[in-house]
Amino acid sequence: MGATNIKEALAYANKQLKPKIDSALSREVYQVVVDAEAFSIDEKVYDTYRPLMYKRRGDMGGLADKGNIIMKGGKATNGVLRVINITDPNPGGVLNRDRVTVGKSLPELIEYGNNNRWGYKYDFQSKGAYMKPRPFTEATVRYLRYVGSHVLALQNGLKRQGVKSRITGSSDENLDDLFF
């Protein structure tokens, strides 16, 4: 190592630890985030109403399909894991071909609602629960903060690589507020 002072020793330790953190984020933590998002989608999106205009794809190509919840950039870098949902609209599942939403980010349309900050609108206008925001990403973050499974996953990922760690702190969020 050759460190002559604490500052150099910490810099060396950081350099050794960063790739291990990124690896744990890209494997163990990513899987926990995907599972939590799929759960949140069921709670905040699918349980909100039953569609009449289209057939839901659910976890078979739809918003809750874990294959549509991906790591942006393919891996965590510099201690940051970015997870996005890339689900496309479902023109094949509509009951009326004149009323199909295409050419828009379906996750953002659902997350932020009709006529959101990007100007996305459903192509079929009517009143309904689907027009309102159904913030599944926010619910995912709140769930993870409360449960802490991502922290345990990080610890397990570091352990896999021979790094000992200890979890400290706790959540003070009320579970009753997670999905209501």
Label the predicted regions.
Residues 79-125:
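Short, internal acidic amphipathic alpha-helical interface segments
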Residues 1-81, 112-180:
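Short, Lys/Arg-rich flexible segments
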